[in-house]
Amino acid sequence: MKSWFRTEDGWAVWLGLILVLLALPSAFGVDLLGWAAKPEVWTSPGQSIAPLSKAYAGYGRAVHVLATTGFVLALVGLGAAWMRFDLVEFMPRFAALFVISCVCYTLGHNAYIAATPDKRAGLGLDWSLGLTGE
């Protein structure tokens, strides 16, 4: 049987478990990941990113984006290092892929794409595709 620490699938499970364990305390009022960035349905680019928790809203959007990117790079880098990947080669490529995917995900939250019919009026829209951001 292969070790769960030597395969990408195994590390996907471990990293997912780490994220679940970090998110679980929020059910009891302890928010460990509220600083992370999340896309919002937006009509202007300045509204596109917000922290997971409103308690962290005082920090700039760039802080949330950089912290989230750094956190994900650290987690994935841990797995890549354990599997003996060449980090000099792996990390910039993963970072580029992560940033591109985040940009696409955020663009998909544009109100004309993502706003559902019940949210259009609140966003000042007459129409939208109603596809949601997911």
Feature names for model-found ranges:
Residues 2-134:
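Helical membrane-embedded segments and adjacent short helical loop/helix-boundary regions
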